[in-house]
């Protein structure tokens, strides 16, 4: 880790993850503050759900790459769980448990927002891939299998719970349940 190339690579990964997180936070803030900007509540919920999911996806990678080993006896670290919308704002730092709770909350929010609003439940993949063959009000809702849809959130929950299960076995059953839903 003393090599300049390695340091630059690590810094680039860390910076890019937090750049994406801040962008997701901006979407969340805008969607929560400007409901009238969306054609309907379902669209707003899908976009919010995707933003919470992408934030959690990146934050989970931050934890895996830069956090402490779950259940390990290694160095204890605190990581910033960013909910800020500006690059110059400092995010609150959390220990492993606090960080994990924030991840769980974000994915639970994403799941709830997508569960009743994601068009993936009302159409087949074929219909969503050929928006001209069915009447879909907003073409943004097409190609849902290529986005962070409800099933992707369930898979991400399973991945997160499996990772957290190394520290606390109660998460293993939750990982199984989330994976079974997919």
Whereabouts are the PLM-identified features?
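Conserved, well-structured interaction surfaces
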Residues: 1-66, 92-97, 112-114
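Inward-facing hydrophobic residues that define packing positions of alpha-helical scaffold repeats
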Residues: 21-24, 100, 107, 114, ...
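Flexible helix-coil transition and linker loops at the boundaries of alpha-helical arrays
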Residues: 33-45, 113-146
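Structural signature of alpha-solenoid helical repeat junctions
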Residues: 40-47, 54, 77, 99, ...
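Structural register within alpha-helical repeat arrays
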Residues: 48, 55, 62, 150, ...
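Short coil/turn linking the two alpha-helices of tandem helical-hairpin repeats
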Residues: 63-70, 118, 163-169
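Short, flexible, mixed-charge acidic loops at enzyme active sites
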Residues: 69-82, 127
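Hydrophobic-face positions in mid-chain alpha helices that act as interaction patches
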Residues: 131-132, 140, 147-148, 162-165, ...
């Amino acid at each position: 880790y003393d090599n300049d190339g390695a340091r630059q690579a690590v810094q680039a990964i860390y910076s890019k993850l937090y750049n994406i997180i801040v962008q997701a936070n901006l979407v969340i803030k805008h969607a929560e503050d400007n409901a009238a900007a969306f054609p309907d509540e379902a669209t707003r919920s899908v976009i919010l759900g995707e933003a919470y999911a992408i934030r959690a996806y990146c934050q989970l990678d931050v934890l895996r790459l830069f956090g402490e080993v779950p259940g390990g006896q290694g160095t204890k670290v605190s990581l910033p769980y960013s909910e800020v919308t500006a690059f110059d704002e400092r995010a609150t730092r959390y220990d492993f448990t606090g960080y994990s709770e924030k991840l769980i909350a974000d994915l639970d929010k994403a799941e709830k927002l997508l569960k009743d609003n994601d068009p993936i439940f009302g159409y087949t993949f074929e219909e969503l891939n050929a928006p001209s063959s069915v009447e879909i009000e907003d073409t943004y809702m097409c190609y849902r299998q290529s986005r962070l849809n409800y099933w992707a959130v369930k898979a991400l929950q399973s991945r997160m719970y499996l990772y957290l299960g190394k520290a606390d076995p109660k998460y293993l059953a939750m990982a199984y349940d989330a994976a079974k839903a997919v």
